[in-house]
Amino acid sequence: MILSLQCVSEPSPGGKWQTLFQKSWTAYKEWFLSEGLISRKGYLTSATMLQHYMPELLPLYEKLSELAGGGDMEARFLSMYCPPPYMSSCSQMAWSHDEVFLIRNYDYSPVLFEGIMLYTNYLKPVIGLSDCSWGLLDGMNADGLAASLAFGGRNICGEGFGIPLIIRYVLETCASTDDAIIKLTSIPSHMSYNVTLLDADGNYATVFVAPDKPPIVNHAAIATNHQENIDWPYYEDMTATRERISVLENYQNQIQETKESLTRKFLHPPLYSYNYQKNFGTLYTARYDIHERELHLVWPDDKKLMQSFANFKESKILVHLSGGNIKKEYL
């Protein structure tokens, strides 16, 4: 199975973003309508909620909607207000000892993965992995604030925004973990997610958001796919979230670790998953080196990709996703 990842630089919304949107819109439209048009919020409601909760993004949203063709359906999709449910299986850790970095494995379906890394300068410079055309799965801004999302393991969907857009908003408007916490705890999320934050001062937190209860600020450096309790046993069994959090707890206490040694550990099960058939295989390992303002993507086959704010290069990489014969590593 081949994973394609394209690195695209476009500081302001324009022709490159428009081309990417046009390529992905057929698939996104099918997903957006998967529960029927009546299940999705109307344009007026969606735009009003975006203006209320993330007003700084409104001019950008209007520009992107125009580039997307100016249609009602496209604008409703881009608002990311009350989208269909979706979930992933991820492991993430903020490290702030001698070195400061955020590392994560993103586990999802390779067929549904957008496969785009974007450098933008909308409200401030941001580098991240794209989802839903302008949302982010993880990313870092030029201030050195990094954020990463993991599904919270709760089979509940409510009224709120898709978490990738919330991640985009946080990185566009915040400079520190404290700033990000304020924003994260003030915006409704349509499903449960765990957002791990790390800033240039080494301050970290993981925020549990949910559609049916108040957010919880957890001053923890690690997260997998449950929150305070296991709410969905079937999902827990399928993704081994408790096993993975135990491994991360062990690693975070080993202060002799370096970013290179921890990165290698993230390339082994149970943190690294080969469960592609059930859409929970690891698609990439991302490490955000905060002080260097660099993003490193790595894979078990020794493929690597590095980008930075100082030298972002447009490129494309193909990765062969295979294996499953690599032993688990706990030490």
What are these regions (language model features)?
Residues M73-A94:
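Short, glycine/charge-rich beta-strand/loop segments that flank catalytic centers
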Residues M1-G70, M80-Y81, H97-D179, K183-S186, ...:
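C-terminal, well-structured catalytic/ligand-binding subdomain of enzymes
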